[in-house]
Design a protein with these regions (language model features):
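GNAT-family acyltransferases
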Residues: 1-76, 94, 126, 131-152
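Amphipathic alpha-helical recognition patches that constitute DNA-binding helices
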Residues: 69, 102, 113
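Conserved acetyl-CoA-binding loop-helix of GNAT-fold acetyltransferases
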Residues: 71-74, 80-97, 116-120
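Conserved GNAT acetyl-CoA-binding A-motif
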Residues: 95-107
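Conserved active-site alpha-helix within GNAT-family acetyltransferase domains
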Residues: 110-127
Length: 152
């Protein structure tokens, strides 16, 4: 969906706390039920990137195809300005509001910038793990940020 076609519908599509959206197509074509979640824009007067949060009601567990509760991306010309660090800090209270005692955030082992963002928010490395097929790389790092140990 393009913003210009229907701005209100586009904005509504960023917020799906009841998982009413269409199923999600995984690499390989398998369709799976959408999880509740929402996406925020990171903004400093201009668009900087997005950060999203998803969860499975009643549990901290995620389906195998969901690598973490939170994902983020910053446009290249806005990197190294603390935007992702602030964005992650800002979204954590919303994670705590759905009752999670911790969130999981994953990254590539060689993505030192994302590792720094996660660690700056209290992330603790819990494992290196093999990614499911279809993700285009072999290994990932899984961090947990605990509600009671959040550092931002």
């Amino acid at each position: 969906m393009r913003i210009a076609e229907d701005p209100a519908a586009f904005l509504a599509s960023l917020e799906d706390r009841e998982a009413k959206g269409a199923p999600v197509e995984l690499p390989g074509g398998k369709m799976v039920k959408r999880l509740p979640g929402f996406r925020r824009w990171m903004w400093d007067g201009a668009f900087c990137g997005t950060i999203g949060f998803r969860w499975q009601p009643g549990t901290t567990e995620l389906p195998p195809h969901c690598l973490g509760h939170i994902g983020f991306a910053v446009v290249p010309w806005k990197r190294r300005q603390g935007i992702a660090t602030r964005g992650l800090c800002d979204i954590l209270p919303e994670a705590w509001a759905v009752g999670l005692p911790f969130v999981e955030v994953t990254t590539d082992p060689d993505n030192t910038a994302s590792r720094r963002v996660i660690e700056a928010n209290g992330g603790i490395l819990i494992e290196e793990f093999a990614l499911p097929s279809g993700y285009g790389r072999a290994m990932g790092l899984r961090y947990r940020i605990f509600r009671d140990e959040q550092e931002c």
